[in-house]
Amino acid sequence: MNRRSFLQRASVTAVGFGVLRNVQACAPAPVLAPVTPLPATFTALRDRFFIFHLQRNPVTSTYLGGDGYSPELADSNMRLRDYRPQSLQDEIRFYRDVKAVLVRMAPAAVAPAQPATVAPSQPAAAAPTVLAPLTPVEQIDYRLMNAQVDFLIHQLGDLRYYQRALDTYVQEPFRGIDWQIQQMPDLGNGLLGNESDWQAVLIRAQAIPVYLEVAKANLLAGKTAGNIPDKRMVQRDGITGSKANADYFRNTLPKTAQPFLGTRPFAQPMLAQLTAAGITAGAAWDAFADFLSQTYDVNEAVDRFASGEAEYEWRVHNALFDPRGAAELYEYGAAQVALYTAKMVEVAREFSAEAKMGLSFNTDAEKNIGIRRVMDFLSKDSPKDDNQLFKWYRDAGERAVAYGRQFNLFDIPAEYRLEVVPTPPVLRSAIDAAYYPAPPFKKAGAGRFYLTPTGNDPAALKLNNFASVADTAVHEGFPGHDWHYRYMNQHADQISNIRWLTPGAVEDSSAMWTDSMPTEGWGLYSEELMAEPRPNHKYGFYSPGEYLYELQGQLLRAVRIRVDVGLHTQRMTFDQAIDYFTEHVSFYPNARLNAAGDPTARAIADSAYRAIYRYSKWPTQAITYNLGKNAIIELREACRAATGAGFSAKTFHERFMGMGPVPVAHFRDTFLAACTPA
């Protein structure tokens, strides 16, 4: 599309709807010079860094409800990130200044217990020249903030990841607006938000065309420098995602807004402006998709997803605070796969005997076939359509809450409910089910358990059979993510601001993933917690068939370790990762090769492709589930041993959740110091 004629048409449309008064909002905000001098105390420095980072990352600010945290973030819902090179250079300069102050104020007691967190391009930090006595809470925050700053300097300065962050560019505008609407106050009678809330949505939508022009310039600079996104990201997140965005802004956004606006005096003009902004944004997204098709070769032979072993290990050490190297993690993954495969064999053997299926589990081949036969047997009880699928998930959530009340696992409010909603189309390429929490710094809004519809595909519905639902409902709902985030949000004033940050991005290839260790670790821990035997409940909350799927969920996260390390250290190709996944998670060897003539193999291979694609673009995220879960278990057992007979699992869980979304390694010693005999 011709850029000049496109802008001329956009201006005519804007005049027709009275939008020109907001056209300045379409341009990026002026470059903000970092405020100097920086504070000399850690708490003040932490707060300055927190505010600055959210000012520069307004969609992350929206996610956290930053406008409810500080007046300095009041306009964050009206903006998209300024990715212009000068703005990013100013950002890097600020982070380097912060790093220098952190080095000067570091007390010896805060020396990392894990490998050094210095980014690859930085020299080793000099010994601190100022000793600042920090409280135990501040020491936790210091370690975390130090890692965050190192990551941001590395990502922006060393990797220049913004030159290839294609999925970030595509997802941020949608997510920002989706989260805005999610957080709007419920005014009753189906109405959401006041005029200022919708004005912020409008201004952010109007900013999209200029935002995409900056993205194009950065991507072209990356192509010139050889800093190029993988072909799969170009096609799936880039081209397909841009087209999904075009449809969302052109059609879905105004349709979504209409009932929420209602018949209030400002509703009709606002809807007209949103419609006009959506049309303009839709055209910009269509043009962006065309740009990507013309700029990149989606059929090129080379793969560009692997981070490389040195980079991968740096992320493991700095972001996840785990001391292990890639080789050790790769072998650890294989051991975890063997562990949970053996557990599945045991349960499948028992199920087969009780169901009189006559299966043998003597040889390795028989074990694989036997597990698959049992799961095929369970898959016969599949939903007839997506409506029934969603009902099963909601029912499983209610059942899990009732079980939690029955065994007094947590103090559960009577009004607690779990909401399950369809995944927005723009996110469906990467997730089957996921949870997005309410913002910690605002009272408005509710968490969302996203479930991706199958489109009533019989083979895909078969993969979501009745026995498979409970485990996912536990992980994403209760006592997994929904319960975890609700508890943390209720105690947000007791959790340091820095612990909520998601440096780089909330959830895409730019993300640091530090928060994934405690949050996804808790989700997986919850699955296992609900499986603990209780009187008349051999498999805890689960039926035998459901428990088999719970074990498969544990196995899946073990496979992720092997695959994630393999992909990013080039121990596995993309296709080898798919084959490993289908063999060890689905017990369906060669599903990829048989997909053309076998609908079940095709559904399994397609699901595996989506999973491997996600791991390929999110290095280290996939390993956080298992690593995070086992860190919680180790902490629990250490606390149990130190506390003795007075140990309370409920108290332990509340204390853990009260630490906020920060890896166990950052607070282990402080936590255990309070685990004393009653």
Predicted segment positions?
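N-terminal maturation segment of proteins
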Residues: A27-A678
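N-terminal export signals
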Residues: S5-P28
